[in-house]
UniProtKB/Swiss-Prot annotation:
Transmembrane segments: none annotated. Homodimer. The gene is ribA. Pathway: Cofactor biosynthesis; riboflavin biosynthesis; 5-amino-6-(D-ribitylamino)uracil from GTP: step 1/4. Gene3D superfamilies: GTP cyclohydrolase II (3.40.50.10990). This is GTP cyclohydrolase-2. It comes from Shigella dysenteriae serotype 1 (strain Sd197). One of its GO terms (biological process) is riboflavin biosynthetic process. It catalyses: GTP + 4 H2O = 2,5-diamino-6-hydroxy-4-(5-phosphoribosylamino)-pyrimidine + formate + 2 phosphate + 3 H(+). InterPro entries: GTP_cyclohydro_II, RibA, RibA-like_sf. Catalyzes the conversion of GTP to 2,5-diamino-6-ribosylamino-4(3H)-pyrimidinone 5'-phosphate (DARP), formate and pyrophosphate. Pfam families: GTP_cyclohydro2.
Length: 196
């Protein structure tokens, strides 16, 4: 286990009341959060989203990505389902950090795509560690999920880490003229399953 469960509190939202559960990485002290809606106990697979932190999309309403749209759509679907989990995976910019993400944006403004920009900065296309998310699910007592994602690599890594993904639920929202090239690159170079 790479994490410990530290604290929880009620979080009222426009979609209803969630239980916010805080986790801390044992090696680094970095924190992550789960939003739990309804009763996730029992043997029925839970609708879940692993949402990687995106300050620009989630909080600043950026149209460069689909992250903020996905966050809102996931919370809506979880609330409509009556139960579910959103893991807020605190690895900003596919885990290159906020300042490097802004540097990558500057390179994209010069014509590089999102993958090329990461490579120019000395990073892999995706630096995230989804095994942390498997540990969060386990600490919540959940081993079977219906995963809201377009990323088959996320499904693969969580499965290898012991989470049974019984269904991949597409989450295709937020395409606009500002992020079309970004989304096309994620599909073509990173294998994301996106429809136009």
């Amino acid at each position: 286990m790479q994490l410990k469960r530290v604290v929880e509190a009620k979080l009222p939202t426009p979609w209803g009341d969630f239980l916010m559960v805080g986790f801390e990485e044992l090696a680094t002290g970095h924190d992550h959060v789960a939003l739990v809606y309804g009763d996730i106990s029992g043997h029925t697979p839970v609708l879940a989203r692993v949402h990687s932190e995106c300050l620009t999309g989630d909080a600043l309403f950026s149209l460069r990505c689909d992250c903020g749209f996905q966050l809102e759509a996931a919370l809506t679907q979880i609330a409509e389902e009556g139960r579910g989990i959103l893991l807020y995976h605190r690895q900003e910019g596919r885990n290159i950090g906020l300042l490097n993400k802004i540097r990558a944006y500057a390179l994209q403004d010069q014509g590089y795509d999102t993958v090329e920009a990461n490579h120019q900065l000395g990073f892999a296309a995706d630096e995230r560690d989804f095994t942390l998310c498997a540990d969060m699910f386990k600490l919540l007592g959940v081993n079977e999920v219906r995963l809201l994602t377009n990323n088959p690599k996320k499904v693969e890594i969580l499965t290898e880490a012991g989470i049974n993904i019984v269904e991949r639920v597409p989450l295709i929202v937020g395409r606009n003229p500002n992020n079309e090239h970004y989304l096309d690159t994620k599909a073509e170079k990173m294998g994301h399953l996106l429809n136009k």
